[in-house]
Amino acid sequence: DKGGVDRLDTSTGIDGKKGPINAPTVFNAAFNFVQFWDGRAADLADQAKGPPTNPVEMGSHSWDDIVARFEMDEEFKKEFLKEYPQVTKETLTHAIGEYEKTLITPNSDFDRYLKGDKTALTEQQVRGYELFKQHKCDTCHTGVAMGGQSYEYMGLYGDYFKDRGTPLTDADEGRFAQTKDPFDMHRFKVPTLRNVALTAPYFHDASAKELKDAVSAMLKYQSNVKQPTQKDVEDITSFLESLTGEFKGEKLK
């Protein structure tokens, strides 16, 4: 549950340490073209290599130590070797990545609507869907996961970071942190919108505490709607609530 996130501004790691950035949802991560906000991992197995030895997240000293611990667990090793030739960093992270591929949440109300059930959405949600398209939100939030297919600049139609009113952090660099290309400064992997009603707070910096706040900010900074109306925000928010899917046959909540 919880939409595949911890619902914290930044995640809590080992010994209560706080991470530097809002954690993306694990649900439907298999559909992302890269992993992490800055795209530093090419796929799920690559992503799984980072947290175990990160001093803030899990704090293991090395992958040699991690492998040795798993080797000591005879029951685990017996079962693991039924699928893999040996216990290594590569096989462990591959296994984690394969598990994450099962964390898919189909059968949202919007899915049913697209399949022809025109009763699946309320009138307000249909209005919100039309506004979503009108403001070209679907240009970036596209594909199976309605996002996760590109890097985009945060603040196309205004200085988001100046208006935020807090000092810049390393996390604000986005893709630039990996490429050092000035073009990539403040560019981030577009997040999925599936289950977005359950994944507050929003954005890499968790600056939007509620979904309606995120909608307002996106309209202002990404769609050039300087003063979005309350009705439009409410309609789009209602539409986004229709994107909550099911996991193991049960609706997420």
Describe each region flagged by the PLM.
Residues D1-K253:
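Periplasmic c-type cytochrome electron-transfer domains
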